[in-house]
Amino acid sequence: MPAFESFRDAASYVAVLAHESAHWTAHPNRVGRDLSRYSKDRTERAREELVAEISAALVCADLNITPELEPRPDHTAYIQTWLSVLSNDRRAIFQAAAHAQRAVNYLHSLQPQADAGEK
């Protein structure tokens, strides 16, 4: 993760942290998404990036924040690859959303539970 100071605001930092945390959940001891082809197959990379982006959106919605991320040069390429995956597989968005929800559920499970009196 880049330093906190390199982000426009706290919401933008949280959005990127949520995205990267979603990738972290893929490990077999967490939610277990198969990333073995991530570095070799652009389609598989696009699928995982969709999962991470949807996860970040869900986390931001849970926290009631709306980040304003700085555009990056690679965003266009990311979106083009996502569009290719989505147009070639009509189930892809549902699969990505399901994986994202599992990732977010796992991240939520790591949070300490509030006492009944704290709610």
Language-model regions, residue ranges each:
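Short pre-active-site segment immediately N-terminal to the catalytic Zn-binding motif
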Residues: 1-16, 46
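Glycine- and acidic
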Residues: 2-5, 34-41, 82-86
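Short, mixed-charge, low-aromatic patches
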Residues: 11-12, 54-58
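Hydrophobic (often cysteine-bearing) scaffold residues that line and stabilize catalytic clefts
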Residues: 14, 48-51, 96
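Active-site recognition of the HExxH zinc-binding catalytic motif
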Residues: 15-28, 52
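Alpha-helical transmembrane segments and their helix-helix packing motifs
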Residues: 28, 32-34
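Active-site metal-coordination segments of metallo-dependent hydrolases
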Residues: 37-53, 66
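Long, well-structured alpha-helical subdomains associated
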Residues: 44, 57-119
